[in-house]
C-alpha cells in the first residue's frame, strides 16, 4: 500500500531513489546529482488544468550546483534538458504515488518551449505538472503538460509529456 501524502521532503525523494518509498516494484527517482527537485509541495488526484491530477515540486538554486561549473564556463546556466527531465521524473513519481509498478521510462514529449533560463543568481525553480490522462493496463502510462518556473516566472513549457512503467526493460 502506497503512503499517499500530499507532499514529500528531500529525504522522502532520496528514499524513492533507493527503492524504499513505493516498494521494491515501484518506480524510483534518480539519485543525486540527477534528482532535479528538493521537495514535492503538492500532489492531488484531481486538480490541475484538466482536473485529472496535479504535482508541484521545487528545486532550490545555489551557485554551487554541479551543472553551473560546466555549462558553460564563464556563462553558467542550468541545461534546459534538466528541467525537461525533472518534469518526466515527476510524471513517473506520480505514477508510483498512484500505486503503479515498474521501472519508469520517458516515452516522449509533444512540444517543448524555452522562453527563459535558470542562472546561478536564481533562488527557486518550481515545476508544475497537469495530468491529462493515466493509462493503467498492461502498460502504466502518464500523459501530462508541464511548466518550469524560475522565481515565479514561467520559462519552459512542455505539452504531452509521456512516461511509462515497465516490468521488464531488457527489450526497451
Swiss-Prot record:
Pathway: Lipid metabolism; fatty acid biosynthesis. One of its GO terms (cellular component) is cytoplasm. It comes from the Bacteria. One of its GO terms (molecular function) is (3R)-hydroxyacyl-[acyl-carrier-protein] dehydratase activity. SUPFAM superfamilies: Thioesterase/thiol ester dehydrase-isomerase (SSF54637). Transmembrane segments: none annotated. Pfam families: FabA (PF07977). GO terms for biological process: unsaturated fatty acid biosynthetic process. Its EC number is 4.2.1.59, 5.3.3.14. Keywords: Cytoplasm, Fatty acid biosynthesis, Fatty acid metabolism, Isomerase, Lipid biosynthesis, Lipid metabolism, Lyase. The keyword Protein biosynthesis does not apply. Coiled coil: none annotated. It catalyses: a (3R)-hydroxyacyl-[ACP] = a (2E)-enoyl-[ACP] + H2O; (3R)-hydroxydecanoyl-[ACP] = (2E)-decenoyl-[ACP] + H2O; (2E)-decenoyl-[ACP] = (3Z)-decenoyl-[ACP]. The active site is at residue 71. Homodimer. Necessary for the introduction of cis unsaturation into fatty acids. Catalyzes the dehydration of (3R)-3-hydroxydecanoyl-ACP to E-(2)-decenoyl-ACP and then its isomerization to Z-(3)-decenoyl-ACP. Can catalyze the dehydratase reaction for beta-hydroxyacyl-ACPs with saturated chain lengths up to 16:0, being most active on intermediate chain length. Belongs to the thioester dehydratase family. FabA subfamily. This is 3-hydroxydecanoyl-[acyl-carrier-protein] dehydratase. It comes from Enterobacter sp. (strain 638).
Amino acid at each position: 500500500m502506497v503512503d499517499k501524502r500530499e507532499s514529500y521532503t528531500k529525504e522522502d525523494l532520496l528514499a524513492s531513489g533507493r527503492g524504499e518509498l513505493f516498494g521494491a516494484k515501484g518506480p524510483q527517482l534518480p539519485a543525486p546529482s540527477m534528482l532535479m527537485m528538493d521537495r514535492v509541495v503538492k500532489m492531488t488526484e484531481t486538480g490541475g488544468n484538466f482536473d485529472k491530477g496535479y504535482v508541484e515540486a521545487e528545486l532550490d538554486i545555489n551557485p554551487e550546483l554541479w551543472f553551473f561549473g560546466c555549462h558553460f564556463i564563464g556563462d553558467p546556466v542550468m541545461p534546459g534538458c534538466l528541467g525537461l527531465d525533472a518534469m518526466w521524473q515527476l510524471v513517473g513519481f506520480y505514477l508510483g504515488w498512484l500505486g503503479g509498478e515498474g521501472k519508469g521510462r520517458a516515452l516522449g514529449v509533444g512540444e517543448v518551449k524555452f522562453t527563459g533560463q535558470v542562472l546561478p543568481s536564481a533562488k527557486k525553480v518550481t515545476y508544475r505538472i497537469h495530468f491529462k490522462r493515466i493509462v493503467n493496463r498492461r502498460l502504466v502510462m502518464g500523459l501530462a503538460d508541464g511548466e518550469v518556473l524560475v522565481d515565479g516566472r514561467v520559462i519552459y513549457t512542455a505539452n504531452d509529456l509521456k512516461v511509462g512503467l515497465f516490468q521488464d526493460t531488457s527489450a526497451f
